[in-house]
Amino acid sequence: MTQKAELEQLLRKLFSGQLLAVLGTQSQSGPYGNLVAFYATDDLKHLLFATTRSTRKYDNLSRTPQVAMVIDNRSNKEGDFHEAMAVTVIGNVKEVGGPEKEQFKALYLAKHPGLFDFVQSPACALLKIEVGTYYIVRQFQQVTELHITP
């Protein structure tokens, strides 16, 4: 197995085991962070999340679509310094529309069925991060980059 294939497998395993991520956006006054429920597509090219259009998060994304998302598997114990893994995703956000919307919505809701009413609301936007790079940190300081080709 190639290093790229191993990293992709590692990411899929992490993403399937985590429900929430920290989304970093940028406002005119500075950075802003939120917890979001996410879904990663199997090809790892997109990460999906939902938000209401009336939020600061949505406003920030409308002005500055570049984001960072952090997903990790920490347990909040001492061993995390050497055993936990964190992934920072860098990419651009777009609202999902057109023919892919129903497909992506079904995938997202399969992972987060408790968010059905929220996602079906007309006020809710389903958003996708078009991933540029994954920064994978393991064993405290081992950093690996995985660049995604569109």
Please provide the spans of the model-predicted regions:
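Extreme N-terminal tail/first-helix region
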Residues: 1-21
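Charged, gly/pro-rich active-site loop segments
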Residues: 2-3, 81-150
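Short helix-coil transition/hinge motifs at the ends and kinks of transmembrane helices
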Residues: 6, 76-80
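Structured helix-beta-strand junction loops
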Residues: 17-18, 64, 111, 132
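Short beta-strand segments
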Residues: 18-53, 61, 68-73, 81, ...
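Short acidic (Asp/Glu) patches
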Residues: 51-55, 70-76, 105-115
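A short, polar/proline- and glycine-enriched secondary-structure boundary/capping micro-motif
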Residues: 58-62, 147-149
